[in-house]
Amino acid sequence: MDRIDRIDKTTKKNRRLSLVVILSVLFILSFGLVFADEWKQALPGYEFSFARDHASHPDYKIEWWYYTGNVVTPDDHRFGYQLTFFRVGVDREPVNPSRWAVRDLFMAHLAVTDISGQKFRFTEKINRAGIGWAGAATDSYRVWNEDWEARQNQQGQMTLRAMQDGIGLELTLDQGKPPVIHGARGISQKGAQAGNASHYYSLTRMPTRGAIVIDGQRYEVTGLSWMDHEFGTSFLEKEQQGWNWLSLQLDDQTELMLYEFRRADGQRDLHTSGTFVDSSGQAATIAASEFTLTPEAQWLSPKTGASYPVIWKVSVPSRRIELTVRAAVNDQELDTRESTRVNYWEGAVEVTGTKDGRPVQGRGYLEMTGYAGAAMSAILK
């Protein structure tokens, strides 16, 4: 047993060292010299095509595939989950043809929230693509990081698989509603400068079944998931500190996505936006002037000292929507110093309120960045 423990500690130490090396490459190369290689910018006029656009877009510097969901066991034990795969371009056309050349780095985050048990668990991975440890296909949808994987099967379903440190998931997701493209003319504008944008779409209501694992215990579950896929090259501007982002699935079969950029001076950024999806899948953009997000209660992180709003009032008068959004568990902060080096809060939320004057309930996910540490504009510049 002592020998196994020593091997395990050595493996973890070596892994930490390899992460330091990879992160050094990421922050020296990825955010310094890469623009000389002319990564493609997210510009108006992009035409989405599915299922092609589920796959990777290696001409762009930054890309992520993001899944969240709220699921439940037959005996009403509730869970939330997040599985995200990130690709960051380092060298668009490496001079060195070696398989060890670093063209892209791949990070991945896995989190499971035991809502009924009031527990939150998180783990992460980071690898380079060149030697097959991680990657993303361009001819079909498959993205992976070691044994974590998201892919589309022959029936058009998404399958997710990830397991590490006593938490994991094995889920099958049906598409549900058609893809929702955010923004206008094929782009979601994030800043004033041309190219400070992304190509961004979502699958907003995906029937889900499979299994969740937490603390080594497996639970069979069903529920709903949400997928985001976003790609671009330069996203934010230096005045932008972070964002508050909500994806809400309401019990009247509608969905609401809102994001609010916060500036370093505390003011709301003009490039705040959102999307409303009706019960038939038709989507409409919500302008910044059409909604407000008001924090009602805070949670102080004992790990980072950051104060995160965990109750929000959401008002969209143009849609006659008035909601209260509450964190299902207050502590859903992700400490990602071994991968993206960004501490952020991302977790399951519960929704109550009114829509069109009638009571409505729902569930969803809330993401809050820029509350702990560096501004997000230093990362996604």
How does the language model describe each region?
Residues 10-21:
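Bacterial N-terminal signal peptides that target proteins for export
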Residues 17, 31-36:
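Intrinsically disordered, low-complexity Ser/Thr/Pro-rich tracts
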Residues 20-30:
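Bacterial N-terminal signal peptides
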Residues 2-11:
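Asp/Glu-rich intrinsically disordered low-complexity tracts
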Residues 35-381:
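Structured soluble/peripheral alpha/beta segments that form catalytic or ligand/cofactor-binding pockets
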